[in-house]
Amino acid sequence: MEIFKEMCPDSEEWKFLREVSLLDIKEDIVYRPYKFLSNGEQTKILLAILFLKENNFLLIDEPTNHLDINARKIIGKYLNRKNGFILVSHDRNLIDSCVNHILSINRRNIEIQKGNFSSWEKNKQQQDELEMLQNEKLKKEITRLEKSARKNAFWSEKLEKSKNRLDVSKTVGFADKGFIGAQAARNMKRSKSIEKRKNKLIEEKSELLHNIDINERIKIHPLQFHNSRLIEFENVSLFYGNNKICENINFVIKQGDRILLKGKNGSGKSSVLKLILGENIKYCGYIYKAKNLKISYVQQNTSNLTGNIFDYINGKQIDKTLFLSILRKMDFSRLQFEKDIASFSEGQKKKILIATSLCEEAHLYIWDEPLNFIDILSRIQIENLILEYSPTLLFVEHDMAFSEKVATKIICL
């Protein structure tokens, strides 16, 4: 409540309580010190305060990074009731649920289009396809005109040379020099006209393809295990101290499965992953883990990344050339390789962890919220990778658009 009074001293308390109720925040949470709230609760409180301010056009920057799937749906429903804001988000479902225009920062320009993300994406794909077809058409026409211009120039030059070699005294009754010269001039004029048309088409072609985002293919190197069953949990309960986090967890991970581990924040998802990885998590129940199973892990936390890219890979047992190549395909410039990773955006740091995992040969890939802060283009790039190579994957992720495309099974905690 103290942050509400600090940021909105002139606003009435009942209005604040109305807004937080729409965001599914219990009233007792409102009266707790702000610093003791979870990241998701803090985000909701700040959103409620933002919309108390009248006559403002609000800027909302990535509000979902610390929210679970259910909380994201609540945020989407809440924002759908509001007007007068710009939302920056990489969550496609959230964008679809609450916006009526898309402001797209393209490679060459900025454009605004009526609709949501899905309609914008469809229009973008159609525009890209149209430009690529037009580009190919122009390329063929330019090649044809080049050949035609060269042919006319060649004949013009040949006629001009033949004119200069003529012996007028021996050519009475045949084409005279004037006729041949005129013919050569016509060919040259035609050649220059064709050249002019060609240059116009080249100029037209140069205006195409500037806003096309080429999603380069990246690869993963999953290993085949000799047995189909890799992991099994049977009636497993997890504890934090003496407090039970979750209970009666039952699932089997078989080779080829892509499993979404789903649950509210604090439901024990990360603890399940860490237990499989062999960390000291208190539990009861039966757990089977195949012997000699190779696991590649992408963690949530990026705060331990330090030094530059070359410092980072020196301590890793991975193909350095492959790692750098993947980063380049994920939109890293070569200049960034020399910079301190601590200065990178959170999305760039997460890409480093994902690129590391993609370089590791493993039977099972475990990814804990891999897409936090990752841009939409890279999310689609990773989706395509997983669908193409079908690694065995256990992951926690709150981006439902990604999860719905990638997951073959869902485990709910």
Task: List where the protein language model places each region.
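ABC ATP-binding cassette signature C-motif
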Residues: M1-N135, F225-L413
